[in-house]
């Protein structure tokens, strides 16, 4: 089965040894993704929108898009940001309504990140 890996050019991908996304057959797995500068200065909503844009770009490289997402896992530093995070998630995924989990964590990388998202997508050719 064909395996395709995608890099987003984020230096930590090489440092840590991972791909932004991997497609195997009809399945696409996108690694945990945070906002990047200059969006790290924004609030949780702005950071989530920026992270989802990076996810969307990775999906497009393997012939998918946000409509193909079937599961999201969102990691948040502060659950007080849930309304902002949910707004960004709803605006981005309302049409496909993926299964979703929200997890509070102590810290993310980079340290100024407030939220991170990882997704699984299924592409029906």
Segments predicted by a language model, with ranges:
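Short, polar/acidic, helix-capping and beta-turn segments at strand->helix junctions
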Residues: 1-125
